[in-house]
Amino acid sequence: MTIDVAAMTRCLKTLSDQTRLIMMRLFLEQEYCVCQLVDMFEMSQPAISQHLRKLKNAGFVNEDRRGQWRYYSINGSCPEFDTLQLILHQIDQEDELLNHIKQKKTQACCQ
């Protein structure tokens, strides 16, 4: 599937932030609760929420509310999904920063 220049620009702009790019790579594998992302990225909850809001506004992620908790996963039905996959699969699985963040994955505090 192809996308127009404006859509590609929005896609690349959203992914241009290192934190959002890594989040999206993680979402290819599974969903995450906000509390897990806070621990993994060692960022404040408002900062994580701001990144997630940008990803959600772009249509790249789904938000699933379960009680007071919010879980995020990749939106496989977004028009840019094929492009997202192509970009995200280019990230080296042995990337030092990606693996550092993955190693901090914890059991969700919300479970």
Swiss-Prot record:
GO biological process per UniProt: regulation of DNA-templated transcription
What the entry lists under Pfam families is as follows: HTH_5
Residue span, HTH arsR-type domain: 1-105
DNA-binding feature ranges: 34-57
Signal peptide position in this chain? none
Q: Where in the cell is it found?
A: Cytoplasm
Where does it primarily localize? Answer: cytoplasm
Q: What is the effect of changing C35S?
A: Binds DNA, but loss of arsenite-mediated regulation
InterPro entries linked: ArsR-like_HTH, HTH_ArsR_DNA-bd_dom, HTH_MetalResp_TranReg, WH-like_DNA-bd_sf, WH_DNA-bd_sf
| UniProt entry keywords in alphabetical sequence | Cytoplasm, DNA-binding, Metal-binding, Metal-thiolate cluster, Repressor, Transcription, Transcription regulation
Residues recorded as binding arsenite, renumbered to this chain, are C33, C35, D39
Known CDD domains for this protein? Answer: HTH_ARSR (cd00090)
* GO terms under cellular component: cytoplasm
| GO terms, molecular function | DNA binding; DNA-binding transcription factor activity; metal ion binding
The record describes the protein's role as: Metal-responsive transcriptional regulator that represses transcription of the aseR-ydfA operon by binding specifically to its promoter. Binding of arsenite or antimonite causes the repressor to dissociate from the DNA.
| Misc note | Can also bind zinc in vitro, but it does not impair DNA binding.
Annotated protein name in UniProt: HTH-type transcriptional repressor AseR
